[in-house]
Amino acid sequence: MSKLFIPYIMGNKDFISNLKVLSDEGADIVEIGLPFSDPVADGPTIMEAGNKAIEEGMNARKILQELKAHKDELKDTKYVLMTYYNIILHYGEEQFIKDCEAAGVYGLIIPDLPFELGEQLKERFKDSSVKIISLIAMTASDDRIQKIAQHADGFIYTVTMNATTGENGQFHPELQSKIEYIQKNADVPVVAGFGIRNPEQVSTLSEFTDGIVIGSEIVKRFANDSETSIRQYLQSIRRALDETKAAANS
């Protein structure tokens, strides 16, 4: 299996065209952020993008409607929604899951929903095609890692730094051993995210992960750079992932 490239974009007025660019350039799964007024897990870049999307009139309902309208064009791309639980609650759980299914959503990442509540949500909608994606922090105990990993759907998102997303900082010193422990206990790919910016970091991390998530850097580039420049950057990330995979197989 190739290493997974999972970029994140904000659900703004341009998100469908951005999604198509990412799909063109080898994204395996795209995370789409639902804009929220109090995004506690987001760094300043994503927070600013979310505020701007809200000003543009974007919300969960509009994003799901657009995904549904473009579903046939996007059929080769898996996309997941990153959303705070309050958005789902406000929307209505059952209707939200139903609309996600209609829009072709592969899964949900809900950073403020603890594992136990996530399992209850899964149980309530066990016949749904929408996966609840698990997050594991580097501070999690071995027992907790085992429990989360053994119940995981889709993929596991490991948080590489104990901070908000996209801020400068060092990767957790025990990252490799933790990820290998998660992989040993999981039947799904284990990807790393938070704070990843460049091909060098991607090459390092993908030696021992099943893929990487890039958020703030991609949001920043879609806000500021030309499409040509964005595509070149995305190609450099895809290349770094493919070269790591090729080296591992040689």
Swiss-Prot record:
GO terms for cellular component: cytosol. SUPFAM superfamilies: Ribulose-phoshate binding barrel. Keywords: Amino-acid biosynthesis, Aromatic amino acid biosynthesis, Lyase, Tryptophan biosynthesis. CDD domains: Tryptophan_synthase_alpha. GO terms for molecular function: tryptophan synthase activity. It is an enzyme of class 4 (lyase). It comes from the Bacteria. The active site is at E31 (proton acceptor), D42 (proton acceptor). Its EC number is 4.2.1.20. InterPro entries: Aldolase_TIM, RibuloseP-bd_barrel, Trp_synthase_alpha_AS, Trp_synthase_suA. The keyword Lyase applies. It catalyses: (1S,2R)-1-C-(indol-3-yl)glycerol 3-phosphate + L-serine = D-glyceraldehyde 3-phosphate + L-tryptophan + H2O. Transmembrane segments: none annotated. Coiled coil: none annotated. Pathway: Amino-acid biosynthesis; L-tryptophan biosynthesis; L-tryptophan from chorismate: step 5/5. The alpha subunit is responsible for the aldol cleavage of indoleglycerol phosphate to indole and glyceraldehyde 3-phosphate. Tetramer of two alpha and two beta chains. Belongs to the TrpA family. NCBIfam families: trpA. This is Tryptophan synthase alpha chain.
